[in-house]
């Protein structure tokens, strides 16, 4: 059985740095999929990241730094919570290009797509 739960409390922002007490992942979980909103790329950390100060600290930059696909991937890799990545809100050629650049930074399987449009593609 599979249950997907989006309950990370990111205040509707596409990117997030997790506090030390989260995410709460049950011991029984055999698969953890990190979900990243591609719409966070191209905006400053301050405007697109929940816990922007922590996100900037993890990245070693300031909150006015513009998020690149590589930077977003670096934070997900640094936190190390998931063994799969789903890049969501990929709805244009530019989004796909950014998603591919992000996927290149991961060693785990990556899927990109749009839950809203019901489409996805395996990037690796």
Regions found by a protein language model. Give the residues of each.
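Conserved catalytic-core segment of NTP-binding enzymes
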Residues: 1-2, 8-109, 116-118, 122-124
